[in-house]
From Swiss-Prot:
Physiological role: With S4 and S12 plays an important role in translational accuracy.
Biological processes annotated in GO: translation
Quaternary structure note: Part of the 30S ribosomal subunit. Contacts proteins S4 and S8.
Keyword Phosphoprotein: no
Similarity annotation: Belongs to the universal ribosomal protein uS5 family.
Domain notes: The N-terminal domain interacts with the head of the 30S subunit; the C-terminal domain interacts with the body and contacts protein S4. The interaction surface between S4 and S5 is involved in control of translational fidelity.
Alphabetized PANTHER family for the sequence: MITOCHONDRIAL RIBOSOMAL PROTEIN S5
Alphabetic keyword roster: Ribonucleoprotein, Ribosomal protein, RNA-binding, rRNA-binding
Organism from which the protein derives: Lactobacillus acidophilus (strain ATCC 700396 / NCK56 / N2 / NCFM)
The protein's name: Small ribosomal subunit protein uS5
Amino acid sequence: MANRNDSRNNRRNKDDIEDQLVAVNRITKVVKGGRRMRFAALVVVGDKKGRVGFGTGKAQEVPEAIRKAVEDGKKKMINVPKVGTTIPHEVIGHYGSGNILLKPAEAGSGVAAGGAVRIVMDMAGISDVTSKSLGSNTPINVVRATIDGLKKLRTSEEVSKLRQPERA
């Protein structure tokens, strides 16, 4: 009887994609009649097997904003190349004034990363990585810079294919 509420608390969908809330902001618009409140949600989605994305959503209520953000995140998913449980090489992701340095780590060392970067790595299924956040520390900038860094990753096969001259 202890697992009665599991279906409500489990955020795993039919297509095996999980989501995790990063931040919720309250937005206030001042109108003639007073203040109009809305909410903006930032969500990271992933299957923990190498696919990850993020989405934002705005609505009058928090649950609706989260739902919109999850839908947006599923549309913008990317594939992340992995070597075992880590990333193939060191990379720097940029977005605005936010920069994220991602370095591969030995197996078993864990995710050495702060808040938003840790969530992105967890959703991507990367369990051994070291990161350093430089510049902006706003959650949306950090998530976008991390995703940019993950987009830049290449496997050794892709790099060797690019280096080989074409033969006619």
